[in-house]
Amino acid sequence: MVLFLLLDKTGNDEIGCVLAREGALIKPGRRWKHLHNPAMTIDRTVEGELPVSDIVEKATALVEELYAENPLPTIRIKPSEAAEPLPVTVSKFGGVPYLPAGVEAPTDSDGVPMGMVAQINCTELPENPIYPPTGMVQFWVSTNVCWGIDKEENHRVIYYPQLGEANPDAVATWEDHERDFWWPIKSECALEFTTPGREIFAPNDSINHPLLEKWNQAYPEQAITSLDDFDVYDVEDIEDFTGSGDYSRLGGLPHFMQGDPRREYPENSDIRRRTVNLLTMDSYGNTVLWGDVGTANWLIAPDRLAARDFSQVFYEWSCS
């Protein structure tokens, strides 16, 4: 391996470095200087000059192997701000929730009604092995300043197997700046569901990515320590499996902004068993904002999901 120094546009000042094998493909649009042979400067100022297809083909083949070994079904959610109030029985972020006649909103540890941040009408989903085929899954969090992350009692996931007559007195939760109340959902959003395929990337976890181990086993002479090393090649195709995953989804992998909080619990803890991603809710423009453009995630143990037991779901939200 050889250390190359990144030069500025003048070719005179060193502004960075990269470790690469001799003769490696390195990022276009830059000038690089061999550390041990300063006279050897690699001019890569012309975009599209590098034959990077070999790297992409190798990585793509390994990704397909990972898909075959451990596919993670994913349903992508595309929100859009509703032009008018949506029916209470449809999938949505925010707005008036579906509540059966005679049923009130769940309350938090202080006895205050929680707010519904998302509800998924299962009949509107593409065929999938994650959600029940019928009914409604709702996500509720406390309206306190922590948005329910402070206590187990302050967030709920509720499943209604069948939809019947709705409670006409159900109300939406909106923020009120006059009383200094902030809420992640600024406006009701309609949801569109698509199935882009499978996920194996782990946003913000490039060091533990399964592709990392598989790449180093297959190509030890080109070993990398993190998927961030692929950034050297500046290839858009690489983003298909090292991307940040900045979108809302059902299934797939959660998107933790500050690392996976489940790691803070012992290996044998029940929290570690909650591995199925029920919902990742990503910030969306100025309409959905989890803190400073963050995300929220809900995860459940596979056996509880199979039993339609949503009483113990791991919930977290964090921002960048």
Question: PLM ranges: what are they?
Answer:
Residues L6, T41-S320:
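Preference for intrinsically disordered or flexible, low-complexity segments
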